[in-house]
A protein has these predicted regions:
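Noncatalytic, beta-rich nucleic-acid-contacting surfaces in large DNA/RNA-processing enzymes
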Residues: 1-275
Length: 275
């Protein structure tokens, strides 16, 4: 999408809008390639954009299934295989979807993921600014830091998956809904406003509304409420979509499963150029 003299290239996908895209598109030329760009900010012209997962990886997985049988279709694989999680911790991640980054491997070795949700958390945290919280989440995981606002167990239930940190955008919505009594629709509006605002105007307007809702709908004491508010203020702008993180982690897990249990077929499929 394009705005004034600055434009950003985004992944391919389906764009849903009320106006014909042919009326909005223009061609841009860069590095000897043409790009079809939308010469407006995304908020001006469309409500939704659905990205497309790289098809090559899924095609390679299908090649493996064609060889080993539908019994091992990705949808039928168990998601709790200890050997697979050991592979992630070992660093042997070549050709593992989205997880073969040399800078991600040391983090996985430290975090020692033991569930698909751990993979999702690490994938989400491997972003600017969220990286600053990596030592905290590793400490929380291995030191049994379960003190996530004891006086209201619902907060613990919401934050336990991310070891007490606000990693996902969806977690923010659940906190507002369950703890402050704010509808999911209103919570999503707050999320968008806060994450777009660079002046802190929206977060300052949000805090008293959130605190009022907590006092009415939760059993948090004043200290816990202040701590939860600070967590939101400090992390909301860096949160990541759980739907994105978890879905990519599942695909990575599938790759790792085949690499562990069907190594020959995996290597053959991922070395093939016939995709």
């Amino acid at each position: 999408h394009y705005n004034d003299s600055v434009y950003k290239r985004k992944p391919c996908g389906f764009v849903i809008t009320t106006e014909k895209l042919s009326n909005l598109n223009t061609f841009l030329y860069e590095e000897q390639e043409y790009y079809l760009a939308i010469k407006h900010t995304k908020d001006e012209i469309y409500d939704s954009k659905f990205d497309l997962v790289e098809q090559k990886v899924l095609n390679r997985l299908q090649l493996i299934v064609n060889q080993i049988g539908e019994k091992y279709h990705p949808y039928k694989l168990p998601l709790n295989d200890e050997k697979v999680f050991n592979l992630f911790a070992s660093g042997d991640l070549y050709n593992i979807f989205q997880f073969d980054s040399p800078t991600l491997k040391p983090l996985l070795a430290q975090f020692k993921p033991n569930s698909i949700y751990d993979l999702s958390v690490i994938f989400a945290m491997f972003r600017p600014r969220l990286k600053d919280y990596i030592p905290t989440i590793i400490h929380n995981k291995f030191n049994g830091n379960n003190n996530y606002f004891h006086s209201d167990t619902r907060v613990y239930d919401i934050l336990n998956e991310t070891y007490g940190l606000l990693i996902y955008q969806e977690t923010f919505l659940h906190l507002l809904n369950k703890i402050a009594g704010i509808s999911f629709a209103e919570a999503e509006l707050w999320r968008r406003k806060i994450m777009r605002d660079k002046s802190n105007t929206e977060i300052n307007a949000f805090i008293p509304i959130f605190n009022k809702g907590c006092k009415k709908n939760s059993t948090l004491n004043d200290i816990e409420m202040a701590s939860l508010t600070n967590l939101i203020v400090n992390m909301i702008n860096y949160t990541f979509p759980k739907t994105h993180s978890l879905s990519y982690s599942i695909i990575a897990y599938w790759c790792a499963y085949y690499k562990v249990h069907f190594r020959t077929h995996f290597d053959k499929a991922f070395s093939s150029n016939n995709i």
